[in-house]
Amino acid sequence: MYEYFKGIISKITAKYIVLEVNSIGYILHVANPYAYSGHLHQEAKVYVHQVVREDAELLYGFATEEEKQLFLSLISVSGIGPVSALAIIAADDNAGLVQAIEQKNITYLTKFPKIGKKTAQQMVLDLEGKVVAADGLAESKAPVQTVDNQELEEAMEAMLALGYKATELKKIKKFFEGTTDTAENYIKSALKMLVK
């Protein structure tokens, strides 16, 4: 088992990053790959969890130890696998997730991909009182400004019209939240991120 890898982020895709450690490139599946864009071709420390299956060995990466612990808590719940756990972490500020578990808010929990009522109830049963918000994540995902960014919205709508997937665009949009730019520049930057 591995605790973390320290290496150079050499590639970023919509689903994973590649971390080069001692001339070996490791594919790390992460919640929001574009959050690592500022560290492309730079050294980074990424916490990891290894999943060994009959047909594959997969590595999941996390920005903080708290994010990794939240992931491990989620996959301990019957009905939640690694892919679903990453989707939950990517879609929420984590503080909201923990609050929903503590308040037994089944409706809130069922908004996550592939989480039905039964799995949401199991989450509450298994995790109530056992999880804490990943503080670093909640802080880093909070938008710097709360006003609507019309230019960013326009850019995302244009890219959706061009055929890009909404799931990819959602991750990119999160990366740009709190910034100010023109729709044209947002599109150019987003295209660069998508082709890397």
From Swiss-Prot:
Sample GO molecular function, one term: four-way junction DNA binding
GO terms for biological process, alphabetical: DNA recombination; DNA repair
Keyword set, alphabetical order: Cytoplasm, DNA damage, DNA recombination, DNA repair, DNA-binding
Localization: Cytoplasm
Broad class of the protein's primary localization: cytoplasm
Segments of this protein annotated with the region Domain I: 1-63
Pfam families for this protein: HHH_5, RuvA_C, RuvA_N
Role this protein plays: The RuvA-RuvB-RuvC complex processes Holliday junction (HJ) DNA during genetic recombination and DNA repair, while the RuvA-RuvB complex plays an important role in the rescue of blocked DNA replication forks via replication fork reversal (RFR). RuvA specifically binds to HJ cruciform DNA, conferring on it an open structure. The RuvB hexamer acts as an ATP-dependent pump, pulling dsDNA into and through the RuvAB complex. HJ branch migration allows RuvC to scan DNA until it finds its consensus sequence, where it cleaves and resolves the cruciform DNA.
Subunit structure: Homotetramer. Forms an RuvA(8)-RuvB(12)-Holliday junction (HJ) complex. HJ DNA is sandwiched between 2 RuvA tetramers; dsDNA enters through RuvA and exits via RuvB. An RuvB hexamer assembles on each DNA strand where it exits the tetramer. Each RuvB hexamer is contacted by two RuvA subunits (via domain III) on 2 adjacent RuvB subunits; this complex drives branch migration. In the full resolvosome a probable DNA-RuvA(4)-RuvB(12)-RuvC(2) complex forms which resolves the HJ.
Family affiliation: Belongs to the RuvA family.
NCBIfam families xref list: ruvA (TIGR00084)
UniProt name for this protein: Holliday junction branch migration complex subunit RuvA
Source organism (scientific name): Streptococcus gordonii (strain Challis / ATCC 35105 / BCRC 15272 / CH1 / DL1 / V288)
Gene: ruvA
